[in-house]
Amino acid sequence: MFHIEYDLRQDKHLTDTPLHFSIRKKEVNAMTCDEALYRQYLSGDDEGLNALMKKYGDPLTLYIDGYLHDVHEAEELMLDVFAYLFTKKPRIRDGGFKAYLYKAARHMALRHKSKRKPLFSLDALTGEPDGRLLAEEVIRTEERNRILHFCMSEMNPDYREVLYLTYFEDMSYAQAAEVTGKTVKQITNMVYRGKESLRRLLEREGITNAES
């Protein structure tokens, strides 16, 4: 579904190289585009919201699934998030659409999770990993990504969330702090600890070149 790089040797949030500024420029352009599409919807053109759903539908579902561990419920909740935008049409500050979207999704996921009856889940068991993940094919990108997803599922949920937001959703530490309700300092600390935890898990699965 998604192509994810697991090389943690470079932290885009802590570098001042020209590439860093190029990335930041792209982030600003992306945020501007999001706000333009949302304003397009507010002005009466549904294509704006359709474009936002197409852009964020899958990654938002994956984020929610990290809380619910049920992709079908996650898809329904993703639609609920956009339904909220349909009906309430909240005012969102410039540059804040993505953070607002994920913050709303997080709130709905936690509320939904608190209302569910406890269910026995095989995810809670510590079983032997699929042997295919430990075979020689691990050098192939598809296998590395599969191992990454497995290791992410084994992590502390708080660390997993901040790594997902900052690396896979390309959020700044400030945006991740807004989504999770934490401070930038806390996010910085959690990213560091999360990378160390992920590196150890990857090494356990035979990947030794994922340095933090």
Language model regions located:
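Acidic, proline/glycine-rich intrinsically disordered inter-domain spacer in sigma factors
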Residues: T126-S153
